[in-house]
């Protein structure tokens, strides 16, 4: 039984380290498939919105890649973990409300409990996609190891996850990335 959103034809759960290119990949897919076919859902959206409300912060600034967001990241992670411990599906339910496109790209899946929730709610139409990039590539995109962030469950929760359905290598080779995206797009179109 699908909760509150439409019934998707395909749910792709994207995960990866900070600065691996998850947003870049999901936005590239959406631009090729069209926003009428494909919705990008961000688990961090409702988390940041609720956190901003409870702490009197600027929600929009928490959503961008700014130093403002980074200043609150550690506390936001702790707060989000407390919410998830009380209700593992809390943020998952929030992001699917009212979504009507047939393809859902969840751009920031970070925990096994997120994957389990989508698999239980949507079954066989759920696929996992891991975006990987070398540390060097991530550093070129501005990543710097931050204790309490890069070693927290929000970054490491899927490091030992069983097999991902798809692995996208995003090390900076545009042609190789393009080939992988085309293969994934073919699969997505076969499910529509």
From Swiss-Prot:
Location in or out of the cell: Cytoplasm, Cytosol
Annotated SUPFAM superfamilies: P-loop containing nucleoside triphosphate hydrolases (SSF52540)
A GO molecular-function descriptor: ATP binding
Alphabetical UniProt keywords: ATP-binding, Cholesterol biosynthesis, Cholesterol metabolism, Cytoplasm, Kinase, Lipid biosynthesis, Lipid metabolism, Nucleotide-binding, Steroid biosynthesis, Steroid metabolism, Sterol biosynthesis, Sterol metabolism, Transferase
Residues annotated as binding ATP: 17-23, 141, 171, 180
Residues bound to substrate: 170
Top class in the EC scheme: transferase
GO cellular component term of the entry, any: cytosol
EC number annotated for this UniProt entry: 2.7.4.2
One GO process term, biological-process aspect: cholesterol biosynthetic process
InterPro entries noted in UniProt: P-loop_NTPase (IPR027417), Pmev_kin_anim (IPR005919)
TM regions (residue ranges): none
Pathway annotation: Isoprenoid biosynthesis; isopentenyl diphosphate biosynthesis via mevalonate pathway; isopentenyl diphosphate from (R)-mevalonate: step 2/3
Catalytic activity: (R)-5-phosphomevalonate + ATP = (R)-5-diphosphomevalonate + ADP
Pfam families, alphabetized: P-mevalo_kinase
Its job: Catalyzes the reversible ATP-dependent phosphorylation of mevalonate 5-phosphate to produce mevalonate diphosphate and ADP, a key step in the mevalonic acid mediated biosynthesis of isopentenyl diphosphate and other polyisoprenoid metabolites.
Subunit comment: Monomer.
Name of the featured protein: Phosphomevalonate kinase
Gene (UniProt): PMVK
């Amino acid at each position: 039984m699908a909760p509150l959103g439409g019934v998707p034809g395909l749910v792709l759960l994207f995960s990866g380290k900070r600065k691996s290119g998850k947003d870049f990949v999901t936005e590239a897919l959406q631009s090729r498939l069209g926003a009428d076919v494909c919705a990008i859902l961000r688990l961090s959206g409702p988390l940041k919105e609720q956190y901003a409300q409870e702490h009197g912060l600027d929600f929009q600034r928490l959503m961008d890649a700014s130093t403002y967001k980074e200043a609150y990241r550690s506390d936001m992670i702790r707060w989000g973990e407390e919410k998830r411990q009380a209700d593992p599906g809390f943020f998952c339910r929030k992001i699917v409300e009212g979504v009507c496109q047939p393809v859902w790209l969840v751009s920031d899946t970070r925990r096994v409990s997120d994957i389990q929730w989508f698999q239980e709610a949507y079954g066989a139409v759920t696929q996992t996609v891991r975006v990987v990039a070398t540390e060097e590539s991530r550093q070129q995109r501005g990543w710097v190891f931050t204790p309490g962030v890069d070693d927290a469950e929000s970054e490491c929760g899927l490091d030992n996850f069983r097999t991902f359905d798809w692995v996208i290598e995003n090390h900076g080779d545009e042609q190789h990335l393009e080939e992988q995206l085309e293969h994934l797009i073919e699969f997505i179109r076969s499910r529509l």
